[in-house]
C-alpha cells in the first residue's frame, strides 16, 4: 500500500529536500576534484601526495553527511519535523533528481542523512530509498564541451597502431613518453600473442573510458575491443619509466586480470566520473560476473557500493532458505565470525571480552579496521563493509549461532519481533582459509599458496604494514588464487616496530627453555622465531625455503623499515610483473632505457 500524500503541501519538506541535495552536490564536487588533483600528482610523481589524497577522500563522505545533519538541525530542527512531512521530503527529493547525473548516489546520501535523524522504525521505503526511485539507464552528460563516458575509435580507417597512439595521446599527460612507438608495438605483439591473427569485422572498433584510473604509481586506460560479436576487455597501465618520462607498462587482455585490478583487496581508484552509473555499466560489460556493488566500491563510491551490497543481501535472503551458521575453521579470540553458505561473504563481530593473551579493546580493534580502510591495501588486504543496526530474520539463524551470539556478543544484539538486530558488524568476502588450503592442497597448490603467502607478507611490510599474527589461518585464498590478509586486530605500522635478532642463549638451560631468555618489548618483533609456527608441515617447509629462505632473516624486515623511514615508496604491481613489456619483450628495449629499471623493480 502506498502511504505517500496526494498533495505536497509542506514548504519545509521542499526546503529540507533541497538542502540535502545541495550538500550531496557539494560532496560529489569534492569527490571529482580529488580525481582531477590525482592527475596532477601522478604527472609530478608525488606519490605521498596521492596517498594523502586517497586517505582524505575515504573520510570525506562521512564529513559531508555530518555537516548536512548539523545544518538540518540548526535550520529546521530536523529531529522534531513531523513524521507526516518526511514522505513529502522524499517525494520532493525525487522530483529534484529527475535530471540529475548521479541520482543513485544522491539517493544513498539522502539515506545516510535520514538514518542519522530518524529512528530505525522509519527505515522503510516511505521515508528512505530502500529501492532506487530514479533510473540510471542511458544517463549521459550533454553539456557543451563535456567529456562523453567513453570514446569510440575505428582502426579500419587509420590502422590499429595509429589508433592506439591516438588513444594514449588523447589523455594529454604532461610528461613525455620514453618511446611511445616502442610501447605501441609491444601492445600489438601482445594482442597477436593472445588472440593470434583475427579478421577485422565490419563493426571493428575500440571503446575507451574518457578518464584515467589512478592508484598507487599507476594510471590505467580501460576499454573494450568490439569485433563481430566478441567484446574483448583491456587495460593499459601507464607508469613513470624514470624521472620525467612515461611508459606503457603492459596491456591486460583477460577478464580475470581486470577483475584482479578491480578486486576488493585493492584500494579504491581515483577516477573522474560525471555519470558514475555509465562508468559502472561499461565496467560490467567487460567484467560481467562482478557485482555492481563491488564496482561502485572500487571506483571510490564505497557508500554506494555498501548500499547496493545491503540490497543484494536482502534480495538473496528473500530468494534462499539456508541458515546463517558459525563460520567453519579455527575460532578467533577477538572476532565472532558467521556466514550464510549460499552467500559468498562472512560476517564478523567484535567479542565483548577477549581471553588472555589478548590485551586490546573494542575501540582499538575498530581503529585497526579503519587503518586498513585508509591504507594502501595493495591487493593483499581484504576490504571490509561496516554496518550498524542490521536486522536478520531469527528463523534464518542456526540455533548454535544464536547461542554463540548470546554468549560472546550480548551487548551487540537485540531482539525485535521476529528479527535479531545486530548493532555493529563487519562484512568481508569469504575466502578459503590458507591453513585449510595448504592442509588439503596438492603439491602444486601448496607451492602456490606458500609462494603467495611469502609475497603477500613481503609486500605488506614494504607498504609499512606488520600483520602481527602471521599464522596461515589469518590469511585467505581468493577466487583468483591471490593470498590476502584478513585478521587486523594485531596489525601495526612496521615503522613503529623494533626489528630484533634473537640473542644467543647464555647457557644450556636457556637453549632448552620453552620461554624467551631475553626481554621482549611491546613493539619488538623477532622474524627468526616465526619458522616453528610456519614450517611444521614438511611439504610446506620445502617450498617455503625454496621461495622465501630470506623470510626469517631480520635484515629483510629492517631493510624495508629503513626504506620507509627514508620516505621511499616501492613499486607494486596489480598484475604479474612478468607481464611487463620490459620483461616480456626485452629485445625491444635498448640499453639504458626503462628495461633495466623494470628488471630491478620486479626482482
UniProtKB/Swiss-Prot annotation:
Reactions this protein catalyses: L-seryl-[isocitrate dehydrogenase] + ATP = O-phospho-L-seryl-[isocitrate dehydrogenase] + ADP + H(+)
Compartment annotation: Cytoplasm
One Gene Ontology cellular component annotation held by this UniProt entry: cytoplasm
Enzyme Commission number, as recorded: 2.7.11.5, 3.1.3.-
GO molecular function list: [isocitrate dehydrogenase (NADP+)] kinase activity; AMP binding; ATP binding; phosphoprotein phosphatase activity; protein serine/threonine kinase activity
GO biological process, one term: glucose metabolic process
NCBIfam families tied to this protein: PRK02946.1
Summary of the function given for this chain in its UniProt record: Bifunctional enzyme which can phosphorylate or dephosphorylate isocitrate dehydrogenase (IDH) on a specific serine residue. This is a regulatory mechanism which enables bacteria to bypass the Krebs cycle via the glyoxylate shunt in response to the source of carbon. When bacteria are grown on glucose, IDH is fully active and unphosphorylated, but when grown on acetate or ethanol, the activity of IDH declines drastically concomitant with its phosphorylation.
Protein's name according to its UniProt entry: Isocitrate dehydrogenase kinase/phosphatase
Species name: Burkholderia thailandensis (strain ATCC 700388 / DSM 13276 / CCUG 48851 / CIP 106301 / E264)
Amino acid at each position: 500500500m502506498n502511504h505517500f500524500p496526494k498533495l505536497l503541501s509542506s514548504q519545509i519538506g521542499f526546503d529540507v529536500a533541497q538542502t540535502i541535495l545541495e550538500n550531496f552536490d557539494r560532496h560529489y564536487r569534492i569527490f571529482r576534484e580529488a580525481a582531477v588533483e590525482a592527475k596532477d600528482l601522478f604527472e609530478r610523481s608525488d606519490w605521498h601526495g596521492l596517498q594523502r589524497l586517497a586517505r582524505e577522500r575515504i573520510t570525506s563522505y562521512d564529513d559531508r553527511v555530518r555537516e548536512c545533519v548539523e545544518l538540518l538541525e540548526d535550520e529546521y530542527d530536523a529531529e522534531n519535523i513531523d513524521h507526516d512531512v518526511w514522505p513529502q521530503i522524499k517525494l520532493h527529493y525525487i522530483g529534484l533528481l529527475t535530471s540529475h547525473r548521479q541520482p543513485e548516489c544522491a539517493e544513498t546520501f539522502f539515506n545516510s542523512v535520514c538514518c542519522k535523524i530518524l529512528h530505525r522504525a522509519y527505515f522503510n521505503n516511505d521515508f528512505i530509498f530502500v529501492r532506487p526511485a530514479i533510473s540510471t539507464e542511458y544517463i549521459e552528460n550533454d553539456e557543451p564541451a563535456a567529456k562523453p563516458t567513453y570514446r569510440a575509435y575505428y582502426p579500419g580507417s587509420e590502422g590499429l597502431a595509429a589508433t592506439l597512439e591516438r588513444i594514449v595521446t588523447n589523455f594529454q599527460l604532461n610528461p613525455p613518453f620514453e618511446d611511445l612507438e616502442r610501447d605501441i608495438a609491444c601492445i600489438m605483439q601482445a594482442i597477436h600473442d593472445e588472440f593470434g591473427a583475427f579478421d577485422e569485422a565490419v563493426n571493428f572498433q575500440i571503446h575507451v573510458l574518457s578518464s584515467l584510473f589512478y592508484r598507487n604509481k599507476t594510471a590505467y586506460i580501460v576499454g573494450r575491443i568490439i569485433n563481430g560479436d566478441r567484446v574483448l576487455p583491456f587495460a593499459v597501465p601507464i607508469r613513470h619509466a624514470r624521472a620525467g618520462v612515461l611508459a606503457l607498462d603492459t596491456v591486460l587482455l583477460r577478464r580475470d586480470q581486470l577483475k584482479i585490478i578491480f578486486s576488493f583487496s585493492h584500494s579504491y581508484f581515483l577516477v573522474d566520473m560525471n555519470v558514475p552509473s555509465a562508468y559502472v555499466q561499461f565496467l560490467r560489460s567487460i567484467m560481467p560476473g562482478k557485482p555492481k556493488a563491488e564496482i561502485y566500491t572500487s571506483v571510490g563510491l564505497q557508500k554506494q557500493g555498501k548500499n547496493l551490497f545491503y540490497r543484494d543481501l536482502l534480495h538473496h535472503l528473500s530468494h534462499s532458505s539456508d541458515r546463517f551458521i558459525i563460520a567453519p575453521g579455527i575460532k578467533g579470540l577477538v572476532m565472532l565470525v558467521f556466514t550464510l553458505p549460499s552467500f559468498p561473504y562472512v560476517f564478523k563481530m567484535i567479542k565483548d571480552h577477549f581471553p588472555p593473551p589478548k590485551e586490546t579493546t573494542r575501540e582499538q580493534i575498530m581503529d585497526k579496521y579503519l587503518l586498513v580502510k585508509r591504507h594502501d591495501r595493495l591487493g593483499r588486504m581484504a576490504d571490509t563493509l561496516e554496518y550498524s543496526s542490521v536486522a536478520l530474520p531469527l528463523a534464518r539463524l542456526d540455533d548454535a549461532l544464536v547461542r554463540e551470539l548470546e554468549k560472546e556478543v550480548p551487548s551487540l544484539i537485540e531482539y525485535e519481533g521476529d528479527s535479531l538486530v545486530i548493532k555493529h558488524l563487519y562484512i568481508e568476502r569469504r575466502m578459503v582459509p590458507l591453513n585449510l588450503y595448504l592442509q588439503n592442497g596438492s603439491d602444486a597448490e601448496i607451492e602456490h599458496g606458500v609462494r603467495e603467502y611469502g609475497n603477500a607478507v613481503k609486500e605488506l611490510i614494504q607498504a609499512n604494514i606488520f600483520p602481527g599474527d602471521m599464522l596461515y589461518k589469518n590469511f585467505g585464498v581468493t577466487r583468483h588464487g591471490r593470498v590476502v590478509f584478513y585478521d587486523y586486530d594485531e596489525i601495526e605500522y612496521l615503522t613503529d616496530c623494533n626489528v630484533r635478532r634473537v640473542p644467543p642463549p647464555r647457557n644450556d638451560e636457556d637453549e632448552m627453555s620453552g620461554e624467551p631468555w631475553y626481554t621482549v618489548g611491546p613493539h619488538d618483533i623477532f622474524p627468526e622465531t616465526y619458522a616453528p609456527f610456519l614450517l611444521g608441515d614438511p611439504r610446506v617447509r620445502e617450498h617455503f625455503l625454496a621461495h622465501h629462505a630470506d623470510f626469517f632473516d631480520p635484515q629483510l624486515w629492517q631493510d624495508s623499515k629503513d626504506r620507509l623511514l627514508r620516505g621511499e615508496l616501492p613499486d607494486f604491481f596489480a598484475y604479474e610483473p612478468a607481464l611487463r613489456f620490459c620483461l616480456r619483450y626485452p629485445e625491444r628495449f635498448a640499453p639504458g632505457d626503462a628495461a633495466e629499471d623494470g628488471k630491478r623493480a620486479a626482482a
